[in-house]
């Protein structure tokens, strides 16, 4: 994997970043570079979560402004770090946990906001549904939307994706 060859400083006009599943070294490097540059970012460990140890995961949480993951990854993060979701959320501006057919939850400012599922007209292709959700999350953060609006937008985009076949 060559993601570590890319550097935050080489890109222009970055105001928000995401560290998503990629090569281990690249994820660590990009988190450090976003933090050093003062650029807020979302830590989205996804299927890459198991390759990090407790201290590395706590470092990601310390550097990140936000974190997003599904409920399985959230449980694994709790187990690997020994921290509760409330503890983890307390270190972030927001922790977003998607729960499949049960919608999602946003932990922010000591509050827990339940975001209802937007039901798709039909299930055509779930591939990319999480990515679509993340795009709504990033758009809401970038636009300064409140968390309920951001979560509802993210859920809507996930539903639109699941109802359509796409690349």
For the regions a language model picked out, list residue spans one by one.
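Ribokinase/PfkB-type carbohydrate-kinase core domain
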Residues: 1-113
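Conserved phosphate-binding/catalytic region of the ribokinase-like
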Residues: 81-167
């Amino acid at each position: 994997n060559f993601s570590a060859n890319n550097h935050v400083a080489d890109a222009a006009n970055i105001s928000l970043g995401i560290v998503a599943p990629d090569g281990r070294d690249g994820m660590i490097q990009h988190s450090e570079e976003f933090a050093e540059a003062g650029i807020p970012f979302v830590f989205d460990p996804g299927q890459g979560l198991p390759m990090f140890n407790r201290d590395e995961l706590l470092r990601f949480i310390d550097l990140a402004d936000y974190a997003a993951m599904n409920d399985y990854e959230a449980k694994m993060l709790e187990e690997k770090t020994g921290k509760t979701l409330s503890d983890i959320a307390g270190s972030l501006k927001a922790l977003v946990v998607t729960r499949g057919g049960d919608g999602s939850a946003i932990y922010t400012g000591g509050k827990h906001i339940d975001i209802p599922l937007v039901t798709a007209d039909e299930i055509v292709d779930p591939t990319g549904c999480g990515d679509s959700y993340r795009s709504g999350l990033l758009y809401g953060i970038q636009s300064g939307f409140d968390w309920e609006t951001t979560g509802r937008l993210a859920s809507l985009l996930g539903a639109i994706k699941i109802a359509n076949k796409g690349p």
